[in-house]
Amino acid sequence: MSTKEKLISHVMKEEPVGSRNKVTVVGVGMVGMASAISILLKDLCDELAMVDVMEDKLKGEVMDLQHGSLFLKTKIVGDKDYSVTANSKVVVVTAGARQQEGESRLNLVQRNVNIFKFIIPNIVKYSPNCILMVVSNPVDILTYVAWKLSGFPRHRVIGSGTNLDSARFRHLIGEKLHLHPSSCHAWIVGEHGDSSVPVWSGVNVAGVSLQGLNPQMGTEGDGENWKAIHKEVVDGAYEVIKLKGYTSWAIGMSVADLVESIIKNMHKVHPVSTLVQGMHGVKDEVFLSVPCVLGNSGLTDVIHMTLKAEEEKQVQKSAETLWGVQKELTL
């Protein structure tokens, strides 16, 4: 008799039970690992699968996390073979070529499209009913690419979009007002990144419109220069990349925030990238961030945000820029 047999006596033969809320992270780079640890520490799933083409790096990261299993409640698995991801509820795609210092997010695009041509069909093969969350940049275009390559309905393909831009925005407004970001309600919509649109008309604290108190807020004529905050939001990522080489922690937390809303069916409203054709005067098939309701089925509803004419024009301009790139892509 083995030690195990002496220690434990079987009462019944266990039937294999699939994971009820499995999450997969594709890509074990800085963003993938920050997303993984954020998901683990929020205890969102009973199984976390990780997949990457870089076998040694993947194996090392998985082992490193598994060594902390005592402190977690989640089973952690990893393999370069996508069968490890089977039956995932949510699949988070962070893989792709990394943005270099000074490189625009749009520049990355065709490099990442080619990577997606391998990743997306594999996800669909093993998790045909999953909710696909795209984080790789340029996120709006790659969410469109993932939607096209997957054949999924639009409500099951979501881009992390401006969830992080809005978090940065709320943090900086909070700093200026000496308030916690959760008490500063503010939204950034449109493209994630350089042409994102701050909705100054909607910024409020406890329902008090800040533009109601300062009608010039967000404009050139504003003596308090609130406009600089949006510039800081846009430059923030570039600044972090310049200082430490990449961004990871905040986007990882942002991803876990979105995964939580889906897994726990919270019906929370998030600015995420979705198909906006027909909204805010957008005519083309593009994905941009607008406030959306996230739950167990994916993206269930879109909130009709009241935008000023100038804000709407900026969203349309974003859409035109993205469509200009998208129509050149070879899918």
Swiss-Prot record:
Pathway the protein contributes to: Fermentation; pyruvate fermentation to lactate; (S)-lactate from pyruvate: step 1/1
Keyword Nucleus: no
Enzyme Commission designation: 1.1.1.27
A GO-annotated cellular component: cytoplasm
Compartments it resides in: Cytoplasm
Keyword annotations: Cytoplasm, NAD, Oxidoreductase
Entries under PROSITE patterns matching the protein: L_LDH (PS00064)
Binding site for NAD(+): 29-57, 98, 137
SUPFAM superfamilies: LDH C-terminal domain-like, NAD(P)-binding Rossmann-fold domains
Keyword field contains NAD: yes
GO MF terms held by the record: L-lactate dehydrogenase activity
Protein family membership: Belongs to the LDH/MDH superfamily. LDH family.
Protein purpose: Interconverts simultaneously and stereospecifically pyruvate and lactate with concomitant interconversion of NADH and NAD(+).
Protein name: L-lactate dehydrogenase A chain
Species whose genome carries this gene: Notothenia angustata
